[in-house]
Amino acid sequence: MKHIIGLDAKRIVRNATGLGSYGRTLVNDLLRTAADDYLFRLYAPDEGREDLRQQVLQHPNLSFCYPQNVSGSKIQDSNVKGDSSLFTPFPSRARLPVAFHSSLFWRTFGIVRDLLRDGVQLYHGLSGELPVGIRKRGIKTVVTIHDLIFLRHPEYYKWIDRKIYAWKFRRTLKEADLIIAISDCTKRDIIHYGHVPEEKIRLVYQSCNTWFKQHVGDDQCQKVNARYELPNRYVIHVGTIEERKNILLAVQALPLLPEDLHLVVVGRQKPYAQQVLSEARRLGVDTRLHLLQGVPNADLPALYQMAEACVYPSRYEGFGIPIIEAIQSGLPVVACTGSCLEEAGGPSCLYVSPDDPEALASALLQVLKGAEGREARILQSQEYVRRFEGTDVASQVLAIYEELLSQR
């Protein structure tokens, strides 16, 4: 008997990093690990970005599924083959109004109809959401919740966004048979804010793409170096440049570090970036600060491997994938206390208060090239993060699927 698993793929086809990376990595790991009696259907409101879809393995047991258009036809991804019988369009009398096909409305309400038609037995919400009414229709459900930052740190969100996220969170808890938390920190938050019994939550750490472990050749490093006009020595931070990421702390530590050491920040820039630039100018270190935006994923391994260390001063994260990427790239990491970053980096990374630039500078001096114990620290961290490699994570997720499917 075939097990048909549906997964929310909106972020998979739209988001290059973060939730998109989580979804693509997990799906690829599931395809490598699952038995042939598993069929995976990725449900997205549209085709999204072709370059992101192509990062998902082509596999006979995988298909992308999209909502019907107003003519009643089904759009199927031509790049990924699957069982075409699952894409039979609705008859004309079942055609849906145009408004039904908006991304939000379809993912919240309309998708359940598609799941039932396609014979989906279990649906996995990969980004903290489940459709309304799915549990009542007999489809088993599991949802991955990455973080509850909007509840822990409401100051980072607009009032209306907090209301919307809170509504989605409460609704999803009612629809979920089981919940996956990607860190123990997130698990505790779900129990605290959602009043969810612990037995309903499974802790499954997020997996990381192992391509960061691969050595980047000198030619590629030289090309990336020239493309971004990189300094000879730098520490790196990867992540959206927003208030929660606390980049100001790293900038304030720069005057306390060697003058030839620079800070390279890779990520999408939000208005907070202007505060970062202003602070760098005030401290006289603006020439040592490099903000890189629009960097393709293919350049990240070289950017990591040419750095001396990774600095991750975020005030709060659900997990902290860039820490694992940096460790796999052979870098020591300095991060901040207060959330789950110790879970991601392990005991051989260094952690400081998110409000103490002197402590951050002191920690960085302990891990720069030439520092005593640096290489041992890197090796110990690399051993620690092996637990986040894909097949182990996929096996845990498959065990959850099997637990729920056995209850049908």
Which residue stretches match the model-derived regions?
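Carbohydrate transferase catalytic cores enriched for Leloir-type hexosyltransferases
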Residues: 1-408
